[in-house]
């Protein structure tokens, strides 16, 4: 019997190419019109095209680039994480509760923190707390924590002022855990607590031997910057006993590192840390809270793997591993199960923000007819032409590789001969154009099925890729892509029903060769170029940079004085319509100048003097108005 297998549609292949289903967690997708949509509640009722949101923003006189926030996604992520732990607690009959603590360092923007807190505003028993890692963050958190469970975790190195602020938080009715990162902090806490008449709540950050893998592995292990070694932990216990303050120790904390890709590393770290908890309980410490820190990963590339940009587990598996490990070890020791805390800031915030901007121009290679070299042409050029004829008229797979290598060598020799005066400028230009044409022909003839061709094809894709000049600063909006090779999903927002027959690289508008996106999610892997529909100058070409809600804004720098982009908070109503709730305008040129201590008033004075001296009187007002418009304008490109 014959069965007909339904072939995937073109749009299904496009969806697979960009791997949207997996990295987006259902919050984004590609509809049947080839448009990228957002669905904050993961249903069709609350689904709208991102390009339609751009039109709304433009109607409000907001130029691209714009960082678009979807607060409903923040609400959904908080619910998903809490629900995963609550289910695990029920599944393992765990006799205590879970608390999700948001470290505001991940994204301190007020509208972000407010929405995270609002996600549980209607709940009687809230499962949210806040974490601060510095004095400024603590001051911000003290004013917000009453909207959550009033639990505050204080991490980071601390001075007298930081500690006094934390203790004052107790006077304000908060439950403030001062986590000791080094031994010297203990004396300071005890001294200031006595001075203020406050009973401190202490936590210990344990320096584990367990260590994860990836970009942040140095956060864990014996060489970690933070935490107390086993001998130091015992010193703290003995000191607290001597001061009759052992009851102040209420929390054990550890942190293996951000973006833990392998669930086995998570389980090993929890197993080691919960033994610290049990041992400390046996020494008389009445610890009730077990803080596993951060580490819950985001699947940036959607491959569900152990790569540093992914994770080989799901949210429910993460929760089950932590709850079951804590429960099993406590059973062995006969100790009560503690309240479990996680500081899962990246997982809460990454999905909620998308940077949307426009392509302002391209540089693309198109094959062109190249004349054969003349009889008196240098021998090097004639050799190159023979290679071109070979690849045109067909040859075997092995010869294709030889032609590629010969072309590489010949082009290098052409550059050398130009530098020594053997070849002139026309010769060099001809050699470069012919080599591109040969590369183009080789790309058509080589196959990914041939493993010897694959590395060459990758190189050819890069050489022949279109260059998309995109209106943004990599250093401001995607600093982790530059600094630590973090992968962020990138794709066009419209026209995906068309042929994705071009490949491109994204280049920003800074005057820096590092301002380029070098890694792209494609299918189940990472590539150096991205499949895209062809760019045309007669219609806008929108690009979206996804999963940028964690760390990117606060880490972004001001290279070339490109400042913060505009941002907009957008909700999707029950009719699938987008509603702009809030707009925060980005930096102007004047803002950036003042930030680097340039006296803008003096600049204006100098302008006026120069204009009065050099410009005709009837033009002076117009010229000064142009200069003033430049100072008040957006730092990104507006007219092109």
Curated annotation (Swiss-Prot):
One of its GO terms (molecular function) is metal ion binding. Pfam families: Arg_decarb_HB, Arg_decarbox_C, Orn_Arg_deC_N. Keywords: Decarboxylase, Lyase, Magnesium, Metal-binding, Polyamine biosynthesis, Pyridoxal phosphate, Spermidine biosynthesis. Its EC number is 4.1.1.19. It is an enzyme of class 4 (lyase). SUPFAM superfamilies: PLP-binding barrel. GO terms for biological process: arginine catabolic process; putrescine biosynthetic process from arginine; spermidine biosynthetic process. The keyword Lyase applies. It catalyses: L-arginine + H(+) = agmatine + CO2. Transmembrane segments: none annotated. Belongs to the Orn/Lys/Arg decarboxylase class-II family. SpeA subfamily. Catalyzes the biosynthesis of agmatine from arginine. This is Biosynthetic arginine decarboxylase. It comes from Vibrio cholerae serotype O1 (strain ATCC 39315 / El Tor Inaba N16961).
């Amino acid at each position: 019997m014959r069965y007909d297998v339904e072939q995937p549609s073109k749009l299904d292949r496009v969806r697979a190419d960009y791997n949207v289903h997996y990295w987006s967690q259902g919050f984004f997708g590609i509809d049947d019109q080839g448009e990228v949509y957002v669905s904050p509640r993961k249903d069709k009722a609350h689904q709208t095209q991102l390009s339609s949101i751009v039109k709304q923003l433009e109607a409000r006189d907001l130029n691209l680039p714009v960082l678009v926030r979807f607060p409903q996604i923040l609400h959904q992520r908080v619910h998903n994480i809490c629900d995963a732990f609550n289910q695990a607690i029920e599944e393992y009959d765990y006799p205590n509760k879970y608390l999700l603590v948001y470290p505001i360092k991940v994204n301190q923007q007020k509208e972000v923190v407010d929405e995270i807190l609002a996600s549980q505003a209607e709940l009687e028993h809230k499962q949210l707390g806040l974490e601060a890692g510095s004095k400024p963050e603590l001051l911000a958190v003290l004013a917000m924590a009453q909207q959550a469970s009033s639990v505050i975790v204080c991490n980071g190195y601390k001075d007298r002022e930081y500690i006094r602020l934390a203790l004052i938080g107790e006077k304000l009715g908060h439950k403030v855990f001062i986590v000791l990162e080094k031994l010297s902090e203990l004396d300071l806490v005890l001294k200031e607590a006595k001075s203020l008449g406050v009973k401190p709540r202490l936590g210990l950050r344990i320096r584990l031997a367990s260590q994860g893998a990836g970009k942040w592995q140095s956060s864990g292990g014996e060489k970690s910057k933070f935490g107390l070694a086993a001998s130091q932990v015992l010193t703290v216990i003995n000191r607290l006993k001597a001061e009759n303050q052992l009851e102040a120790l209420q929390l054990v904390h550890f942190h293996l590192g951000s973006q833990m890709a392998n669930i086995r590393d998570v389980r090993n770290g929890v197993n080691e840390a919960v033994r610290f908890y049990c041992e400390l309980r046996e020494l008389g410490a009445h610890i009730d809270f077990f803080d596993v820190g951060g580490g819950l990963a985001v699947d940036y590339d959607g491959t569900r793997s152990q790569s540093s940009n992914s994770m080989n587990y799901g949210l429910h598996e993460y929760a089950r591993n932590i709850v079951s490990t804590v429960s099993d070890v406590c059973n062995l020791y006969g100790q009560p199960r503690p309240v479990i805390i996680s500081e899962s800031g990246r997982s809460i915030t990454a999905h909620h923000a998308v940077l949307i901007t426009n392509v302002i121009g391209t540089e693309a290679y198109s094959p062109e007819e190249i004349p054969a070299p003349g009889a008196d042409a240098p021998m090097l050029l004639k050799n190159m032409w023979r290679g071109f004829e070979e690849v045109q008229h067909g040859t075997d797979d092995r010869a294709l590789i030889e032609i590629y290598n010969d072309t590489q060598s010949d082009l290098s020799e052409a550059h050398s001969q130009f530098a020594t005066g053997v070849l002139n400028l026309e010769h060099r230009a001809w050699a470069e154009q012919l080599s591109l044409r040969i590369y183009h022909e080789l790309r058509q003839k080589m196959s990914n099925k041939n493993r010897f061709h694959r590395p060459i094809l990758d190189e050819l894709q890069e050489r022949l890729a279109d260059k998309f000049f995109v209106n943004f600063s990599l250093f401001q909006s995607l600093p982790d892509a530059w600094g630590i090779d973090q992968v962020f999903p990138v794709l066009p927002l419209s026209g995906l029903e068309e042929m994705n027959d071009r490949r491109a690289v994204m280049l920003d508008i800074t005057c820096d060769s590092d301002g380029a996106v070098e890694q792209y999610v494609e299918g189940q892997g990472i590539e150096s170029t991205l499949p895209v529909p062809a760019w045309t100058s007669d219609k806008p070409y929108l690009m979206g940079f996804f999963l940028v809600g964690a760390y990117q804004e606060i880490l972004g720098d001001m290279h070339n004085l490109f400042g913060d982009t505009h941002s907009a908070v957008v909700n999707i109503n029950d009719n699938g319509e987008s509603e702009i709730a809030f707009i925060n305008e980005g930096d102007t040129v004047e803002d950036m100048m003042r930030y680097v201590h340039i006296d803008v008033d003096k600049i204006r004075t100098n302008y006026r003097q120069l204009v009065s001296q050099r410009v005709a009187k009837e033009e002076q007002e117009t010229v000064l108005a142009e200069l003033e418009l430049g100072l008040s304008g957006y730092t990104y490109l507006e007219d092109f």
